[in-house]
Amino acid sequence: MRAIAHVSIAAMLLMGSSGRGSAQTPTDFFKGRTVDLYIGYSVGGGYDVYARMIARHMGRHIPGNPTIIPKNMEGAGSIRLANWLYNVAPRDGTAFGTVSRGAPFDPLLGSPATQFDGREFTWIGSANNEVSVCVAWHTTGVARFEDLLSKELVVGGSSAASDTDQFAKLLNALFGTKLKVATGYPGGNEINLAIERGEVGGRCGWSWSSVVATHKHWLEQNRIAVLIQTALSKHADLPDVPLATDLARSEEQRQIIWLIFARQVMGRPFMAPPGVPPERAIVLRDAFMSTMKDPQFLADAEKAKLEITPVSGADIEKLVKEVYRTPKETAAKAAAMIR
């Protein structure tokens, strides 16, 4: 792994402004171009659905109206894409992506697969502030969180870097649940198919917005039980489902829970590589937030049952830096729990 300089995103943006073509106006630069939107998961999952919806509308809000092309680059729970964006992708504003909300924090947690510093990405925004859940299939005999203390539930996972794996392992370490992770599925869509086939009995780290958007019929037909919410606060739809944060028994547990679940604030994050010229970074940020208020986008999102509670790129940048200030001892304990 090459050495990663701890440079602020502001400095990286200033460095990028000296590059070729910085004298162009954003309209001149983006006119007639295509912008690639990379998705760190397979087709059909929650990250993919959100990204493709945004790709259909965001180009209208970028000066010059470029065409945005969604492309999937799944692998290693989206760490493959995060590494590529950081080290390989063009830094001129023509490439950005969406990765697991937890991926930017993996270097802090000691993941050997990461080749980036989450603080240095050009953060564009998030489509929502997310709540995730653990669910169990109706035939497993697991109907509530307390059942997990005495009965093993096999849950599907994407990789050691994904919420699907990390949240289940954290619950085991903190509360003594008996969640067994069967990992290696390319994305959430494949995990859901595995649940239907009986390969696994449920999943953790499943975004509630994705549950409602893609599998609301499972809820309506009582085919799954929602066991626990893994976030910093409850979702309004789930007042009677326990929140992991409320189960903490010590200040140390609360600190670890905050470290791992703070990512939920940036539920569907979008970022460009470090070093994007500052005027283009501003354009992408503004275009993203304008898209989040676009009546056509919101109408399409409502039809698709996508929850839209946007978070600005500036707020994400602030959050990521705050999480990276976690004491090393706390981060090390959290890392041991989720590996």
Predicted features and spans:
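Hinge/capping helix and adjacent helix->loop/strand transition within the periplasmic-binding protein
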Residues: 35, 60-65, 84-95, 103-198, ...
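A ligand-binding cleft/hinge motif common to bilobed small-molecule-binding domains
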Residues: 101-113, 165, 169-174, 202-247
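Extracytoplasmic "Venus flytrap"
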Residues: 36-50, 74-77, 156-163
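Bacterial N-terminal signal peptides
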Residues: 6-17
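Sec/Tat signal peptide C-region and signal peptidase I cleavage site
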Residues: 19-23
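Short beta-strand->loop
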Residues: 119-127, 178-184, 214-263, 312, ...
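An extracytoplasmic/periplasmic, membrane-proximal ligand-sensing/linker region
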Residues: 31-33, 220-222, 247, 265, ...
